[in-house]
């Protein structure tokens, strides 16, 4: 049994110096916790959740300083993101869960599944968590410039919850940290250590912040991951790009969730 009967709930979950806005659909189905993109919100998952339907227990939340309600923090590190998963699960009384992460959330999901093999039913990683050395000095500078260029309009959108309440430097630092976590010597051993059913859903082409075939080169790194670990497979490669995959190819993500649950 992975979930006891619960009623739908929406509220704030305290963790460290902050609190996270969370929604739990309740029910007795398999718990699925959804891990957002780096600066995205829980609303991105609505189509996947609709595809799966009410037979699952869907748990979504907004990370620190994301969305309209999650509070700011002194710590926006990757390890803080891992702690937040545990805080959400503890607050909702969930022991075992299936993790589904997109982009940055895929990295969180991979790390959490690797560290918690007895608690992870499985993982679905959507166009993220691919070991590749894409960060160098030139890329780091490109990241900082990109967030500086975006800084002028960010305050205008923050009241809508569409952009995070991190400043340009904080966003760049978070993205650069992700580049370091992505390195083959860092992420490769994490992927090799996963012992639960794990499925990738991959996007195609380029999206915001990438050039040429950069993202396809990164995706190609998964061939080695799949060859080394029999628990990991590619469920689908879809036509949509990284930014639109949850909107245009949500059905493929839902299918991967069912695939993992059926293993």
What are these regions (language model features)?
Residues 18-68:
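Conserved HGGG/HGGXW glycine-rich cap/lid loop of the alpha/beta-hydrolase fold
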């Amino acid at each position: 049994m992975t979930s006891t009967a619960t009623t739908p709930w929406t509220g704030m979950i305290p963790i460290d110096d902050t609190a996270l806005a969370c929604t739990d659909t309740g029910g007795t189905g398999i718990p699925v916790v959804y891990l957002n993109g780096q600066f995205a919100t829980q609303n991105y998952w609505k189509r996947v959740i609709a595809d799966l339907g009410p037979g699952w227990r869907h748990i979504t939340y907004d990370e620190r300083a994301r969305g309209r309600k999650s509070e700011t923090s002194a710590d926006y590190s990757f390890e803080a993101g891992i702690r937040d998963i545990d805080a959400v699960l503890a607050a909702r009384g969930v022991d075992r869960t299936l993790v589904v992460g997109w982009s940055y959330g895929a990295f969180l999901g991979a790390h959490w599944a690797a560290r918690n093999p007895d608690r992870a039913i499985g993982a679905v990683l959507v166009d993220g968590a691919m070991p590749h050395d894409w960060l160098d000095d030139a890329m780091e500078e490109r990241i900082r410039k990109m967030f500086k260029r975006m800084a002028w309009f960010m305050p205008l959108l923050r009241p809508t919850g569409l952009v995070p309440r991190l400043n340009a430097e904080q966003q760049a630092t978070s993205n650069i940290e992700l580049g370091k976590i992505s390195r083959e010597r860092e992420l490769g051993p994490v992927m090799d250590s996963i012992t639960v059913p794990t499925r990738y859903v991959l996007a195609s082409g380029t999206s915001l912040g990438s050039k040429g075939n950069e993202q396809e080169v990164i995706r190609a790194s998964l061939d080695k991951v799949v060859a080394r670990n029999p628990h990991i497979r590619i469920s689908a490669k879809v036509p949509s790009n990284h930014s639109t995959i949850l909107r245009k190819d949500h059905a493929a993500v839902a299918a991967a969730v069912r695939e993992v649950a059926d293993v």
